[in-house]
Amino acid sequence: MDPDAQTRAAIEEHWRASERGDTEAEHAVYADDAILDYPQSGERFRGRDAISAQRGGHPASRHFTVLRITGTGSLWVSECVITYDGVPTYSVSIMEFAYGHVVHESQYFADPFGAPSWRAALAEPMPGRSIASA
């Protein structure tokens, strides 16, 4: 298997493990000294153990739907919908790899929002979706 296929497979398993609640398998993709940044809150988590502990301690029921994984070499991006207690949040995860493991990840979160009326004539619904009202 070529290196990009191996990395994609590792990311896919990361998200499958996240969905099934297997925190050990979910975090196997991270280097021991990996860094996870949440730029919107200003938080940084150092090391696989800290990353795993903060995710494992989340109080909400979570479900993960992967929309897209793209990348090559050391830089990969996942777009997901993470549903917390039934409420969807869109997430973009930017992962930097070295020696087969994530060494740095930045994860961004965005709640759905209503589309403003001024651009209604310019937009069409995304596949499988309807346009939310403001």
Label each PLM-derived region with a short phrase.
Residues M1-D32, L122-A134:
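Short, low-complexity N-terminal intrinsically disordered segments enriched in polar/charged residues
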Residues H14, Y30, Y38, F45, ...:
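Aromatic side chains
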Residues M1-P3, S52-A134:
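A beta-strand edge to alpha-helix "cap/lid" segment located at domain peripheries
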Residues H14-A17, L36-D37, E79, T83:
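Alpha-helix C-capping/helix-to-loop hinge sites
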Residues A10, E26, A34, S41, ...:
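A general marker of short, structured functional hotspots
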Residues A5, R20-S74:
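A solvent-exposed, acidic/Ser-Thr-rich amphipathic alpha-helical stretch
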